[in-house]
């Protein structure tokens, strides 16, 4: 991979099928989960347009960025408040650093502050759930990011 990481941290849940032998369960992870210090700022890995800002149960606040050529990245578990603008678009403000805010249809450059990561209540760290899509296929983000 050649792309910068969206946050500095370590992958705690890999892409694809995860087998838990203790619980005898199998789960499918459509992205990766990166553990980072709480309140870490997430950065864009490519330039593009914010196509959607929404809340999804189990994923928290979600920001979807369209990078053109049918590529999208999805940042989940983003801290902040979502407001609806008079034109119907949404804006998300970080409650940790209010200077960090993005809006739907906004063009953002590579390495742009897109949000802060919500605190994970169990261990005082943050977890970013990060996905890369091409058309309707989810890709393994780890293979796109610079190897650590």
Describe the residue ranges of each PLM region.
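Flexible, gly/ser-rich surface segments that form the specificity/activation loops bordering the active-site cleft
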Residues: 51-57, 110-127
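Beta-strand/loop nucleic-acid-binding surfaces
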Residues: 74-82
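A secondary-structure micro-motif
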Residues: 84, 88, 96, 117-120, ...
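Short, surface-exposed ligand- or partner-binding patches at beta-edge/loop junctions that are enriched
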Residues: 130
């Amino acid at each position: 991979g050649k792309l910068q990481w969206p946050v500095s941290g370590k992958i705690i849940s890999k892409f694809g099928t995860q087998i838990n032998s203790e619980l005898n369960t199998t789960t499918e992870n459509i992205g990766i989960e990166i553990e980072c210090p709480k309140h870490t700022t997430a950065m864009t890995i490519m330039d593009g347009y914010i196509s959607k800002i929404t809340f999804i149960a189990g994923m928290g606040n979600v920001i979807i960025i369209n990078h053109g050529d049918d590529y999208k990245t999805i940042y989940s578990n983003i801290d902040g408040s979502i407001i609806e603008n008079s034109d119907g678009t949404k804006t998300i403000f970080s409650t940790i650093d209010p200077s960090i805010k993005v809006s739907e249809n906004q063009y953002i450059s590579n390495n742009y502050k897109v949000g802060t990561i919500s605190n994970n209540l169990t261990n005082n760290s943050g977890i970013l759930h990060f996905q890369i899509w091409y058309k309707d296929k989810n890709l393994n983000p780890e293979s796109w990011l610079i190897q650590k």
